[in-house]
Amino acid sequence: MNKKLMYIFAIFIVAAITCISQPKKTTLRDKAMVNYAFDYLSSPGSLPFTTAATELSAIHGHSTSQYRLGEFYLHGSDGKPLDYTQARYWYEQSAEQENPRAQSKLGWIYLKGLGVKPDTRKAILWYKEAAEQGYAHAQYTLGLIYRNGSGINVNHYESQKWLKLTAKQHYKNAERLLAGLPAH
């Protein structure tokens, strides 16, 4: 067995033990270790190892890995088939740990009806979870939903509220949209 494979195996074992010992919430140390493993394994030719590492740590509760596994299923990438049900499952696991990117993706799934019946109200709930943590993309999307009345009544006040929060984070599209909204 060559040195690279032994090193990869050691990283998997350490990551698995760390994830098992922290089932509810991951620590900064856990995140750093898993991110290091992902960076190391992201070199050309390491796809099976990256996917396996992601799946292993996702199963053991690592929020970022759960989000990434959701991405694999949502896009049918990294050796995983396109499967909206699995994507939603893994995003939900990550969202329960307050991962704003996963919460925002759940909003997208419900807004677009990917594997579920479109549900603007559920989408808004998930986007708000992420937006209230300061996640600019979710804030911007909420601003658009309220501005355009996507499945709900137009609400300029809510639209401006979320777009202003997004603009404070230098999100240029939000700044442009704010210029065209009626003042409140």
UniProtKB/Swiss-Prot annotation:
Keywords: Repeat. Induction: Repressed by the toxin-antitoxin module MqsR-MqsA. To E.coli YbeQ. It holds the Pfam family Sel1. SMART domains: SEL1 (SM00671). It comes from Escherichia coli (strain K12). Transmembrane segments: none annotated. InterPro entries: Mitotic_Regulator, Sel1-like, TPR-like_helical_dom_sf. This is Sel1-repeat-containing protein YbeT. Sel1-like repeats lie at residues 64-98, 100-135, 136-169.
